Amino acid sequence: MISPVVISRLIDEKKSMENGAILPQAIAQPQLCPTKPALARRDGVSMHRRFALSPDRLGILTPSDDQGLETEPLSTGDNLGKGSHSGFSSITITARRVGPPASSLVWDTFRDPLCPKCKAKDALFQEPPVLAGDAHLCQHNRPFTCTESPSNGSVEGMKVFQAHSRLSARQDYWVTHTNDNEDSFSSDNSPSRKVPLVFSSCVHFRVSQQCPNAIYYLDKSLSVPLERPQIASPKMHRSVLSLSLRCSSHQLTADGVDSSANGEPISTALSQELSEGKQDLLGPQWGQPQGGHWKESPALVPVHLGSGTCPRTGSPPLENVKFADVGRNQVPVRKEKEDHATCTSSSHTNQLSIHIPGWSYRAETKVLSGSKKQQQEAQRTLPAFPVGQKTIKHFPPEGDSSPSSDGQPSILSESNERQHPYFMIPRVPLPGFYCPLQTGCASLQEDGAVQIETHFPKDYTCCDLVVKLKECEKNEDPTVTPEPSPATPSPSTPEGAQSSDPSEDSYEPLLASSMTLQEALEVHRPQFISRSQERLQKLKRMVQQRKTQQKESLGQKQSLLPVRANKKQFTIPHPLSDNLFKPKERCISEKEMHMRSKRIYNNLPEVKKKKEEQKKRMILQSNRLRAEVFKKQLLDQLLQRNAV
């Protein structure tokens, strides 16, 4: 954190240099200790070192295994860079701007002034960031090289170089710049024109061509206060992501010199507008601001990536750079391509990937094809994903996408894009790639830029990537409406479709709009109507036959029964109807009553028991009689034997 004392000292130095040189005051950073070689995978290399600015002095925080974080005071002596630490640590640079109270500021968006240091040393930033509207912040990482062993393919080590000179092109420094009409940051000297309060920062480093197929992780954050100004107008922050790509080739042009000597930069810049009336574009961390709290937000991060040859001449795959952030915002990316005479198309894929987890992505494509420069725009708005999800979207090379001569993408590319509308890692193509991303979805415009430029010596090729992020917040304002996006031009239709009969084309919508269902059936399905009419007639005939049969059956029944004058005539109901006739209960005769009573009496349990006992007595009596008869017969036989 930069204390107010340091800022006031810088302001005093600036006031003394108002009539002198234009170059703003620079604070030199110390030389970094070179890190030891660390083993890593071939596809992943990360460099981390932590910096911090003390309130009373500038210092470097380096990780220590025994004592934690140690502060090394800044100095320009010869004792810099003596100690060495194993492994890598992350680079964290923070700054605080002490300015007028929030009530005297107007939160708005404006174009940042150019950074003279960046513009003089490296034409990479077309629009460097501004710190707090008055202070200009620009931080550069030193270039580092990462040598790769050809035998095993593993990374041998990483070295961080720096220059002791203050005016070195790759020296880390903080630049503080104020306008001429403002001489302090205090609230007493507030400017007459209320300046927007903007917080931003940048990181700039270059990757050598000796590290193909490597992944570098950058972590650049910026502390931003969340307190709001006390004004009646809608209060909001603004979020911007800017990408800048540069690539140079050492190949010779037709006149025998390289492209840098000819001064033929491929420089294209686009801008996107962010509608400030959309509430769902804001991340959850910007919901309710709290006084005295600070929010870390991503800032400007330029990255230089290198390859052995021109990206469009079939060189090995370029490094993949991934940026990690936990916000949920819209990341606008707009790409523009110009055909260059020194580079030829190839089937090899050299791609650059940006990974921002949890962010929505919308890409707008504008293609300039050759000298015709026919433009084509496409937009896509995607919902945010959980932080853990990582889906990769690939942009095929220009040779594989087979675009038409006027910059129109193929229909197959459009269908593929519609089938996969959600992705998290947009692939930013280099200046030899064609982006087929197209959709007609209307969404909000956002600020951002992608620049592709050739401005490097001919001994190596390098690609630079600049990322500029600003967080945004706003109150719900129903009067603000989102700005509709331009419609995507539809691809040209083939000649065969255009040569079709115009009468048929006009007849189809006429049928769909003016015809009724019956008319449409008569035209397209005449047999359906005829069959329906036949079924209706058949049902009517069946009803008539049923009625005649019922009348005949009723006449026969009435003729069989005698007609009695004294008997009331009742209608005979249908047997299946619910309205059945119930006649009177008839009278029971005496005989029937006696039989009924006897049947009930015999079924009584006492009567049944009595009948069983009586039956047993009859059986016993018959057995006695049989015994007497047997005795008598036996006696007679004995008497006859004796007589003989």
UniProtKB/Swiss-Prot annotation:
GO MF annotation terms: histone deacetylase binding; ubiquitin protein ligase activity
Localisation: Cytoplasm; Cytoplasm, Cytoskeleton, Microtubule organizing center, Centrosome
EC number in record: 2.3.2.-
Keyword Chloroplast: no
Inducers of expression: Upon DNA damage by agents such as ionizing radiation, UV and actinomycin D. Activated by p53/TP53.
Low complexity bias spans: 398-410
Coiled-coil regions listed in the entry: 598-629
EC primary class: transferase
Compositionally biased tracts (Pro residues): 481-492
Tissue: Highly expressed in testis. Weak expression found in brain, lung, heart, ovary, thymus, spleen and kidney.
Keywords in alphabetical order: Coiled coil, Cytoplasm, Cytoskeleton, Transferase, Tumor suppressor, Ubl conjugation pathway
GO cellular component entries: centrosome; cytoplasm
Residue span of region Required for interaction with p53/TP53: 1-67
Region spans: ALMS motif: 516-644
Record Pfam families: ALMS_motif (PF15309), Centro_C10orf90 (PF17730)
Region annotation (Required for interaction with HDAC1) ranges: 67-175
A single GO BP: mitotic G2 DNA damage checkpoint signaling
Main subcellular localisation: cytoplasm
Region span, Disordered: 62-83, 305-349, 367-413, 475-507
InterPro entries linked: ALMS_motif, C10orf90_N
Quaternary context: Interacts with HDAC1; the interaction prevents binding of HDAC1 to CDKN1A/p21 and facilitates the acetylation and stabilization of CDKN1A/p21. Interacts with p53/TP53; the interaction inhibits binding of p53/TP53 and MDM2.
Protein function: Tumor suppressor that is required to sustain G2/M checkpoint after DNA damage. Acts as a p53/TP53 activator by inhibiting MDM2 binding to p53/TP53 and stimulating non-proteolytic polyubiquitination of p53/TP53. Exhibits ubiquitin ligase (E3) activity and assemble ubiquitin polymers through 'Lys-11'- (K11-), 'Lys-29'- (K29-) and 'Lys-63'- (K63)-linkages, independently of the ubiquitin-conjugating enzyme (E2). Promotes p53/TP53-dependent transcription of CDKN1A/p21, leading to robust checkpoint response. Mediates CDKN1A/p21 protein stability in a ubiquitin-independent manner.
Protein name as annotated: (E2-independent) E3 ubiquitin-conjugating enzyme FATS
Organism: Mus musculus
Lineage, highest ranks first: Eukaryota, Metazoa, Chordata, Craniata, Vertebrata
